[in-house]
Amino acid sequence: FCAGTAMAALALGAVAGCGYDDLADRRFDLVINATSASLHGELPPLPERLLASGAWCYDMMYGATATPFMRWAERHRAGKVLDGLGMLVEQAAESFFLWRGVRPETAPVIAMLRRELEKDG
């Protein structure tokens, strides 16, 4: 399972890292904010023209309201903007499956958690 997933990922193309200064003249179809900036209500120093047309933006942070990164993505017309709540639930479901052999339905859990976050927010 993991080896097949890794091979499929490698077939998509090369993966490389860089600093914020190296992003100025590049466009991306997918931008994942895995920095700690959202924990502090801050926005990473992103170039204005970072997103390709229809790009997806994903913030690992989740909460009752959109993060600064998510608001930035919406202002820059990202095709899709998501937070990390789905990843949290899906990782828990995958762990439950590995431990118990049962794959829980995640959509109702995500919906319930989203409602609870909105109540508290």
Model-predicted segments: where are they?
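Short acidic low-complexity segments
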Residues: 13-28
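Short, well-ordered alpha-helix to beta-strand connector turns
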Residues: 28, 54-55
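Short glycine-/small-residue-rich Rossmann-like dinucleotide-binding loops
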Residues: 35-37, 61-62
